[in-house]
């Protein structure tokens, strides 16, 4: 009996305390009413009410009366805690400024009362909110998209409401909030450091967030596993993540899964499935998917060739790339072809060696102004083995500018005009440097001053002065000046609209490699403005722009992986870039497969896949790829032996790219009658053409011609009067099937013997000493008037 009385008293106290807390909440929430802000109160001002029960058509039911008792006791406990302690990570003013551990210490989890909706009351359907009746839970008025309902008919009058979520939904939401914290902490480390150890630590955070089904973390980790970026490469794990993302409708996941089916990595190759996933990815707005589809429609890969469809996809991507171009320009990406680098080890790939960079740094520290400006430009744009670093660029430009270098002043002006984390944006400071550089006749400064007058940056807009400075810069060949002149003529700003002049200056700027010049030319050719409309030309120009996007940095990442002998990571990265239409990636992927360096591809699939990418690279005009296609058909690598097809590829390489190797091969095929009728005269002609096309071909051509002379002599004897004597003579049977190789070897040995003998003769002949200088005759000084003037 006493227990029941105590329990009754306890319940009565709890009810009274709960009523008092509810009254206090009602008064507090009146200031944040929906009528005044047209949005629901934040999670901090209203407790999160969920239920362990079920939601049926928006109506929430409580499982038992015991749940109500527990909720009242929970409310009493909650009322003793201040609301200031309940800090939500997603609504903190600057979540990226705190690490995950700091945020976790500050944030306390929102306590969930198991009492249905607000105050334990069920939803009232319909309910009135902003003069509109709702028959089910809604997310209107909330920025976070959470469903809610009112517990009375008119929300404006009573302001009683609650969230329409079960305890399971609330747990998922809290898990997502924690996952977001972990993801932000990882991204802060990833974006704030260039050290590999810290980036690996960042990916540990991202992996943890991905394990909690955080979509962005899943996207990051899946591609990191695919490429082996700071994580051990695992194609199967990447595939599973792509499938999970695809089920959730992630465009990045769909594009990744499409790539796996296109390349046959981790799955059986299926171009049909690849096309489906690429299409879904493009519909979701993924730029990589758009670029892949643009290339496929342009080249007719898996689809009917359609220039207009390719134009649609490429133009969309090019619009994004052009909008990202800054005044200082983006990072420079070096396109290095592995076949060329291996064939010509001494070839300059454009990459700077570490010791050379250190030498320039030494010169810069000693006050060499040219070295300071050069290093400043390298660090400003990146590339050639130097990472982009605006702080170092600013420091080097400052040193050179203080020494009076106009180029450094102009680039400082560009950095101040653009603004960054290192250099604060300042039109006044930029104008100061531009004027100093322009007064010294520097075209970069003149172009910057023209931009200031064109857009009114620190000065009044003055189109005449803008035109004047752009013309001065363009006359000195500066691409920015040429581009801006073209834009002024195209839009008729400060001058009469003139599409011919615009086309002229855009062409000049494009010859200097300016991305926006290519973009503007593409727009003109696509719309037929100032020129005859040409879909093909527009697509090629837009493709050029698209290949300058931020994803092109993956080319250098793949190259570095190859240099580190991580061939699997390199080939996967090159394969994705090859899907996007990069010719250099297609040839590099084919080269790695051709060398059988990547174990990620099966033995039986190596040559067929290499053949596929050699073919795509050859169709984009790469000579080595065209010759490789001939070699593959000649020897039967990845396909059947087909001399006629090999002959066609060699002939194309000879006619279109004037390849000495292709000419030599054509000579050999004419000599042997492989894929073509045997013709000794045509064989000699192609051998001679090869020797003229390349000095490197002269020695093998000489040997081939010597052998050809012997063959011609034997053929002549056969057709002479003593034909009957040699009718039965079969050189292959007499000397063996490789008799021509033996003959070439003998000729080479004889030639070497003659050369050695001649050199020895020259050494034996005593070299006469030159006679000593004769004493100069004494000079007689003439009279002073005959001396020449000094």
UniProtKB/Swiss-Prot annotation:
Biased composition (Pro residues): 767-790
CDD domains (alphabetical): FN2 (cd00062)
Residues bearing attached sugar chains per UniProt: 191, 213, 268, 427, 604
SMART domains: FN2 (SM00059), SEL1 (SM00671)
Region called Important for homodimerization and oligomerization, residue ranges: 348-533
Null allele phenotype: Taxomifen-inducible gene disruption in adult mice leads to premature death within 3 weeks after the onset of taxomifen treatment. Mice progressively loose weight and become moribund despite increased food intake and normal blood glucose levels, suggesting nutrient maladsorption. After eight days of treatment, the pancreas was diffusely dark red and soft, suggesting severe pancreas atrophy. Still, the endocrine parts of the pancreas were not affected.
Protein name as annotated: Protein sel-1 homolog 1
Source organism per UniProt: Mus musculus
Recorded name of the encoding gene: Sel1l
């Amino acid at each position: 009996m006493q227990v029941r009385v105590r329990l009754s008293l306890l319940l009565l106290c709890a009810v009274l305390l709960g009523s008092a807390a509810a009254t206090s909440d009602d008064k507090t929430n009146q200031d944040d009413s929906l009528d005044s802000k047209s949005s629901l109160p934040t999670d901090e001002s209203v407790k999160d009410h969920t239920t362990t029960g079920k939601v049926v058509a928006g109506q929430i039911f409580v499982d038992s009366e015991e749940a109500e008792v527990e909720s009242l006791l929970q409310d009493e406990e909650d009322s003793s805690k201040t609301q200031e302690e309940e800090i939500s990570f997603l609504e903190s003013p600057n979540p990226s400024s705190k690490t995950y551990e700091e945020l976790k210490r500050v944030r306390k989890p929102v306590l969930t009362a198991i009492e249905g909706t607000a105050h334990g009351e069920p939803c009232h359907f319909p309910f009135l909110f902003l003069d509109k009746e709702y028959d089910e839970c809604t997310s209107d008025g909330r920025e976070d998209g959470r469903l809610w309902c009112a517990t009375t008919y008119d929300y404006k009058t009573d302001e009683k409401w609650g969230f329409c979520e079960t305890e399971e939904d609330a747990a998922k939401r809290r898990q997502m909030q924690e996952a977001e914290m972990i993801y932000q902490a990882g991204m802060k480390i990833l974006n704030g450091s260039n050290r590999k150890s810290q980036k690996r630590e960042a990916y540990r955070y991202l992996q943890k967030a991905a394990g909690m089904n955080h979509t962005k973390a899943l996207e990051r980790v899946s591609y990191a596993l695919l490429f082996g970026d700071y994580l051990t490469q695992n194609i199967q794990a990447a595939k599973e993540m792509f499938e999970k993302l695809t089920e959730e409708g992630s465009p990045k996941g769909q594009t990744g899964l499409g790539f796996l089916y296109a390349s046959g990595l981790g799955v059986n190759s299926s171009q049909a499935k690849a096309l489906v996933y690429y299409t879904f990815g493009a519909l979701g707005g993924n730029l990589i998917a758009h670029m892949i589809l643009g290339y496929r429609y342009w080249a007719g890969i898996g689809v009917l060739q359609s220039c207009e469809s390719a134009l649609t996809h490429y133009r969309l991507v090019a619009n994004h790339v052009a909008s990202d171009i800054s005044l200082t320009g983006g990072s420079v990406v070096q396109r290095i072809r592995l076949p060329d680098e291996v064939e010509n080890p001494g070839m300059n790939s454009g990459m700077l060696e570490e010791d050379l960079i250190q030498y320039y740094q030494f010169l810069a520290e000693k006050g060499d102004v040219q070295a300071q400006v050069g290093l400043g430009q390298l660090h400003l744009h990146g590339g050639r083995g130097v990472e982009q670093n605006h702080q170092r660029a600013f420091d080097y430009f400052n040193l050179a500018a203080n020494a009076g270098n106009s180029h450094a002043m102009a680039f400082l002006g560009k950095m101040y005009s653009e603004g960054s984390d290192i250099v604060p944006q300042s039109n006044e400071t930029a104008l100061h440097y531009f004027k100093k550089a322009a007064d010294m006749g520097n075209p970069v400064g003149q172009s910057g001053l023209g931009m200031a007058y064109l857009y009114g940056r620190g000065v009044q807009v003055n189109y005449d002065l803008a035109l004047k400075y752009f013309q001065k810069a363009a006359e000195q060949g500066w691409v920015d000046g040429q581009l801006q002149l073209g834009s002024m003529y195209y839009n008729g700003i400060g001058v009469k609209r003139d599409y011919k002049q615009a086309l002229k200056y855009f062409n000049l700027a494009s010859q200097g490699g300016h991305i926006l010049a290519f973009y503007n030319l593409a727009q003109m050719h696509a719309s037929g403005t100032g020129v005859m409309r040409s879909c093909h030309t527009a697509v090629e120009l837009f493709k050029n722009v698209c290949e300058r996007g931020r994803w092109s940095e993956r080319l250098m990442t793949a190259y570095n992986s190859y240099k580190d002998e991580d061939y699997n990571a390199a080939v996967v990265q090159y394969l994705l870039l090859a899907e996007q239409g990069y010719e250099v990636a297609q040839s590099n992927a084919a080269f790695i497969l051709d060398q059988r360096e990547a174990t990620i591809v099966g033995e039986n699939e190596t040559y067929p896949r290499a053949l596929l990418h050699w073919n795509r690279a050859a169709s984009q005009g790469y000579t080595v790829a065209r010759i490789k296609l001939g070699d593959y058909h000649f020897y039967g690598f990845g396909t059947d032996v087909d001399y006629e097809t090999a002959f066609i590829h060699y002939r194309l390489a000879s006619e279109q790219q004037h390849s000495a190797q292709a000419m030599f091969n054509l000579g050999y095929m004419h000599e042997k009658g492989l894929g073509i009728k045997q013709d000794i005269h045509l064989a000699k002609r192609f051998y001679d053409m090869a020797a003229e096309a390349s000095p490197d071909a002269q020695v093998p051509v000489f040997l081939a011609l010597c052998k050809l002379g012997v063959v011609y002599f034997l053929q002549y004897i056969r057709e002479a009067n003593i034909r009957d004597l040699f009718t039965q003579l079969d050189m292959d049977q007499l000397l063996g099937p490789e008799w021509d190789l033996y003959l070439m070897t003998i000729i080479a040995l004889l030639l070497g013997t003659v050369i050695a003998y001649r050199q020895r003769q020259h050494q034996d002949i005593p070299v006469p000493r030159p006679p000593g200088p004769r004493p100069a005759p004494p000079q007689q000084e003439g009279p002073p008037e005959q001396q020449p003037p000094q």
